[in-house]
Amino acid sequence: MENMYQYGTGRRKSSSARVFLKTGTGNITINNRKLNNYFSRRTARLIILQPIEFVNMSKKCDLYITVKGGGISGQVGAIRHGISRALIKYDSSFRNELRKLGFITRDSRQVERKKVGFRKARKRPQFSKR
């Protein structure tokens, strides 16, 4: 198991992330940039670290991540989903713990399409009685 990559794919909204996990010292690289440089928002970094810290692997593994599509929120969710899947491949005993927290479940919510005759997906034109 030493120096072997474990792979996980995560998706959220229109973002998709490929996560490669291997034993190491806790380095996280996203699109060839450090975690702190890629996501300046503290909440985004905390969401990404949730599954790793929950299973006490934050200083035991290195992560190499490529993510594309979407915005900050979608990319963060996709990365968290991918990390969770990679951790399960690394050690299947993490499955039940991560399942209880909802990290394994793919968030299937998507942007609703705009309808013809409406201003947005659900916003209708102003109604006039007379």
From Swiss-Prot:
User: Where does the signal sequence lie?
Assistant: none
Cited Gene3D superfamilies: 3.30.230.10
Does the record's keyword annotation contain Ribosomal protein? yes
Please provide the Gene Ontology terms (biological process) for this protein. translation
As one GO molecular function, the record gives: structural constituent of ribosome
What keywords would UniProt list here? Ribonucleoprotein, Ribosomal protein
Q: Which Pfam families did the record assign?
A: Ribosomal_S9
Q: Which GO terms describe its cellular component?
A: cytosolic small ribosomal subunit
- Report the transmembrane regions from the record: none
Similarity comment: family membership: Belongs to the universal ribosomal protein uS9 family.
Cross-referenced HAMAP family: Ribosomal_uS9_B (MF_00532_B)
Any idea what this protein is called? Small ribosomal subunit protein uS9
Q: Which organism is it from?
A: Buchnera aphidicola subsp. Baizongia pistaciae (strain Bp)
